[in-house]
């Protein structure tokens, strides 16, 4: 019996590899970290794989602190989560604007970090898995034809299943 090891996020896209051409970048944006992996001609480049402490929780903390600093009140984490996941919540506009501004800054930081690792949307496609995809979709400025957000929460499990039968 053998054991296979795969870079973080890779199983989530394994069923889509047939569509990959040229250079692609995978960003797995989870709660605590963003894992970055280059995939060239359908092959993971393990030597071009990095982890940044830039997970969704950093955005959550920043949003809650911004509301506390600006309005002097604590906001429920579930309310902030609603905004981050769906882009809105049933709260007054000043609070929504405050949190949305933080989310836009966070997404800008995500893209800045990707550029640090030579991400160029003109030269490659970006695939995003994990909870951070919601933030990019709701608060990011990007070319939708060059960025694929995989929001299937079962994508990783499906990928591992496929890998088990390869």
Give each language-model segment a name.
Residues 12, 39-42, 66-73, 113:
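Short hydrophobic alpha-helical module
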Residues 1-24, 45-58, 78-166:
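Nucleotide/phosphate-binding catalytic cleft detector across ATP-hydrolyzing
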